[in-house]
């Protein structure tokens, strides 16, 4: 297999390193802006050179972002080349266009490293779907948020201090918005739900709330009451269709999620026959992520393409009623659903997920967490 590697950053360099001594996978091109010297590899900025080379059968997209990543991926598929990517934002955003194009052109596409880094989560979901119905998916999908919340819980740190530590260690970007506002997790749970349920979720119907507004006083109150706060993703089958959302969640001490440390991920599925099973590991990093890119390349060599067919676009309906801890919001609606006071916040009576997320849009300084 001759591959063209798009991008030579953290993941791209990792893929190059892991394929260097393989006889079945050959990096023929690297497309990047940097001036790097790689023995036996053509380093270029001219993507048309790759598209015109019929000996290149697979493109590995490791650039990140939406553009030009999607433009390059789309052009590769239209040129009859297989594609592997670790780019969850691109795969999620263009899912409705991507899968039909892959099918039309008769090429193979995989994106295992897009969710869970080195865990192999999407591959496992594809295997599960061969045998049975997946009932629900979700869990801790973002290592940055888990590191921040873990340090706030274990060390009593303020949010800003825990975030700065994560940035110093390379777990958080200089601009951490995609992580702490839940967008990274949102992309991942939508991709996971699409694969698990064989649909394409309408992204506008999947609400998301992050951890940006959490304070040390919240965490102290949770700890006192036997809870640990985690950013939890949820995708599930319901009696009326499908539900999907991302929100901080208070996990009882008895829950496995409550004990996931540092920047690790724990992602879970429940099957009708297999029951509840979880995958645990590093959700990011050069070699864990590159490892699953290479695993995808090996699957392409075996003729294995995407994990599941897509039956069409569906809307998520999040009418499940949960109790929520809320701090920072104050209006007549919140007062009407308040059941009790917890420290500086309140706890609601059970309210629908969609309803409280719609209310939250007008409360920019509010912190919200579901209670299990």
Region locations from a protein language model:
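Rossmann-fold NAD(P)-binding glycine/threonine-rich loop
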Residues: 70-74, 88-126
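Glycine-rich adenosine-cofactor-binding loop
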Residues: 2-17
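Oxidoreductase and adenylate-handling cofactor-binding alpha/beta cores
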Residues: 119-134, 145-160, 187-201, 296
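Rossmann-fold NAD(P) dinucleotide-binding segment
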Residues: 45-86
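A conserved regulatory-domain signal marking ACT and ACT-like small-molecule sensing domains
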Residues: 297-299, 303-372
